[in-house]
Amino acid sequence: MKALIAIDSFKGCLTSMEAGKAALEAFTEGEAEIIPVSDGGEGFSTILTESLGGTFRTAVCHDPIGRPIKARYGLADSTAIIETAAASGLGLLRKDELNPLKATSYGTGELILDALE
């Protein structure tokens, strides 16, 4: 039997690859291949960058409420792979900081600018 293990990440718990490896441990008969997948959310840039044989770059930008942070994006040939959540995601904020009237996606723009340089 051949099996394809394609599991999305479990937000805040397992990456797609980690989930696939856990499932592979339970697969004892036949051949299995792990293919990381993403619905376009958390982990998307990592999966796409690695699938394209790209590299990662880290840049200083600002989180949704203006604090300086370091965020990572992918580069594959002349294509930048930027995940909005890296600079503008809710996961960067504490619960008491969640306020759409004060949040900004400026940091994502900073990542785009860094990629263009």
Residue ranges of predicted features:
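N-terminal loops that bind phosphate or other acidic moieties
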Residues: M1-E117
